[in-house]
Amino acid sequence: MEWKLEQSMREQALLKAQLTQLKESLKEVQLERDEYAEHLKGERARWQQRMRKMSQEVCSLKKEKKHDKYRVEKLERSLSKLKNQMAEPLPPEPPAVPSEVELQHLRKELERVAGALQAQVEYNQRISLLNEGQKERLREQEERLQEQQERLPEQEERLQQLAEPQNSFKELNNENKSVLQLEQQVKELQEKLGKERLEAASQQKQQLTAQLSLMALPGEGHGGEHLDSEGEEAPRPMPSVPEDLESREAMSGFMDHLEEKADLSELVEKEELGFFQYYRERCHQKVYHPITKPGGSAKDAAPGGGHHQAGPGQGGDEGEAAGAAGDGVAAGGDYKGHSKFLVTAQNPAHEPSPGAPAPQELGAAHKHGDLCEVSLTDSVEPVQGEAREGSPHDNPTAQPIVQDHQEHPGLGSNCCVPFFCWAWLPRRRR
């Protein structure tokens, strides 16, 4: 669960980084989109305004063209009338010579009409040229409008592409919410697991205190068989399935409870194995410590003659059993060294406490190869290394033991080797 939690936290950090990057890119894309949309709006407004002006100019030019056509037609009619009048032979009139004033007036009128006609023709030519230029401009504008219309779907696609990061942002938000929900579930599971561990630890502690109380009681009338029976592990009661579980939901809940109980028992066994290994290493260190002292010996470290190595005639299992017995005796000897300070704390005159077994009993138990109960208040002759230790206040190792003994005075009468040493010995025998 912790690995999943770390993985979810890493994924959450990566998602947050991606989310920030996407937010920044989304802001940039939105700014570009807004600028491009404003640019398009401005271009459209300008083109629409120009188209309106051009359409107004075209309408005015059309009106002027119609008016000019009407005037040209009128002048052409008048000119044709004048030509006809000039081409028709004059009726015979009485020989009367027209006056020069009338002739001059007619000539002036003819010149004026010809000049007006010429000016109208030139004006029409200019208008036609302007119309051609306007037509070319209109074609260009139509082509540009077509290009703009062709670009519109591309722009719409681009706007859709710009809107895609927003959708991805929403998806990331949903993923982030799911990750937060998963993290909350993991926290709830961790809290539940912690509560179950505490409950299992409390139950285990109660069982261990019960075992310690049973082991603290002296064995009566059974000898080596009683010690062997106490050294072996008690079989665990198998969980019984209740008979009233008929529904599937109740059965599934019961099976889940059994699985959780099995997981917790495995965790407790792992912790016990680690603690056993630590205690064994500590026992070995305390066995080797008095040997390395000047004047110390292996007999002082392991009273009762414990052998750690199997002889040439022994098998592998016998060697292991002998090594286990030697380790147990070493642990008992170490605790005997500490019991001296307990005796000095309670009995200043080094009087043996009542109910303590003799050293011969320890030797006999070691010969059997099975140590079930070793008293910490045995009267053991101090070796040269222990003689230099003095009072419990001079030894920092013994001070917490004496303090614990003073805080719990009930343990002084029959202090035993802890239960985990005897739980470890049957494993060594197997």
UniProtKB/Swiss-Prot annotation:
GO biological process: Golgi organization
Keyword Coiled coil (UniProt): yes
Coiled coil: 2-217
GO CC annotation: cis-Golgi network; Golgi cis cisterna; Golgi cisterna membrane
Nucleotidyltransferase found in the keyword field: no
Compositionally biased spans, kind Gly residues: 303-316
Keywords per UniProt: Coiled coil
Family, as annotated: Belongs to the GOLGA8 family.
Name the record gives this protein: Putative golgin subfamily A member 8D
